[in-house]
Amino acid sequence: MPLASLEVGQHLYWQIGGLKVHGQVLITSWIVIGILVIVSVLATRKVERIPSGLQNFMEYALEFVRDLTKNQIGEKEYRPWVPFIGTLFLFIFVSNWSGALFPWKLISLPEGELAAPTNDINTTVALALCTSFVYFYAGFRKKGLGYFRKYIEPTPVLLPIAILEDFTKPLSLSFRLFGNILADELVVAVLVLLVPLIVPLPVMLLGLFTSGIQALVFATLAGAYIHESLEGHGEEEEAH
């Protein structure tokens, strides 16, 4: 296959009601969700007091996510947010690794080609918007209308900056994840075409590492934003 045959932005469109959606993103997202559900069911089907095998792995993953959430949100209020942070981390982690390990491009489609769900900007923007909604909800649930005082404290002059900050958070989350995963898959694809045997292997291993790091960064920032929403700048300063 010639290098010129590499394409970016080709999509399989599905018409659902009045909406036009990217079909290949839904397919790969369902596959990732299916993998997570199947592994979870198998790991918890026969729970033992002394875990082993898949149960041991899942308990380690749960402990990792719980510690991550606790470190970002704090001992007192982290528990309700473990499911959300854990879902984000596991979905992004498996999605990223699927792009590096699964031969999506061997599956032919009428248009476009399959790739990791996080290789599509729509997926990363959706994850970032969910995170934004959750940290707004967290602050509003705890403080009520008083949550919005942060926009005018310590002075109303900072209102535009505070609003701009709320817009830049989901933008940075979505474009960081999308850009890293897309760049990694493109680099591997180009190297496979040019030198198909040995050279791409180190890059693929590096891609697996960076894919895991991107999932960790996204989940860590989501936890940090929720903590900021729960505590607020003023309360954090008083605590110190």
Swiss-Prot record:
Name of protein: ATP synthase subunit a 1
Subcellular location: Cellular thylakoid membrane
Subunit structure, as described in the record: F-type ATPases have 2 components, CF(1) - the catalytic core - and CF(0) - the membrane proton channel. CF(1) has five subunits: alpha(3), beta(3), gamma(1), delta(1), epsilon(1). CF(0) has four main subunits: a, b, b' and c.
Topological type in the membrane: Multi-pass membrane protein
Keyword terms: ATP synthesis, CF(0), Hydrogen ion transport, Ion transport, Membrane, Thylakoid, Transmembrane, Transmembrane helix, Transport
General function of this protein: Key component of the proton channel; it plays a direct role in the translocation of protons across the membrane.
Family note: Belongs to the ATPase A chain family.
Cited InterPro entries: ATP_syn_F0_a_bact/chloroplast, ATP_synth_F0_asu, ATP_synth_F0_asu_AS, F0_ATP_A_sf
Membrane-spanning intervals of the chain: 23-43, 82-102, 120-140, 186-206, 207-227
Alphabetical list of PANTHER family matching this protein: ATP SYNTHASE SUBUNIT A, CHLOROPLASTIC
The keyword rRNA-binding belongs to this UniProt entry's keyword annotation: no
Gene Ontology MF, one: proton-transporting ATP synthase activity, rotational mechanism
Signal peptide start and end residues: none
Any one of the GO CC terms: proton-transporting ATP synthase complex
